[in-house]
Amino acid sequence: MTLTATRTARQHRPFTVTLVTTLLATLGIGAVGGGWAMIFGIGGESMLPDEYLETIPLVDNWVVPGVVLLIGFGFGSLIAAYGVWRRPIWAWLGGLERLTGHHWSWTATILIGAGQVTWITLELLSIPFSVLMAIFGPLGLALVLLALTPSVSGYIRLK
């Protein structure tokens, strides 16, 4: 088997696994777009008012939050979605898999979900409410809770 071989690809995929993959992909696509817009703006203009920066500690511009959004939640979620769906074997993540007893994408899903809940909580404390907070906060919580269900956990558990 190669490093990109997949585990038991023909095994029945529960609906909850499809749902987790869809939620990760949705978060990933939204975060790539949002992160890009925070870093580069839309038409050269920032998508968020600079006065919001006054309430956010440790940052002077939207680049750092944009990079976290783009790379961490954007690309990270898309890679995790691929991992949940295909379960590729990547040798460099073998230690994590031995530690958890699950495919690396299970751990990534929980970390991304918990990170998203934390991110939205910090947003709620720092900037005015947005409907996106009401969408992506519960999405993060759903990722954590779904990853812990027997159907998802069992599907991603190493045999």
Question: What do these predicted regions represent?
Answer:
Residues 2-159:
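Topology signature of small-to-medium multi-pass alpha-helical membrane proteins
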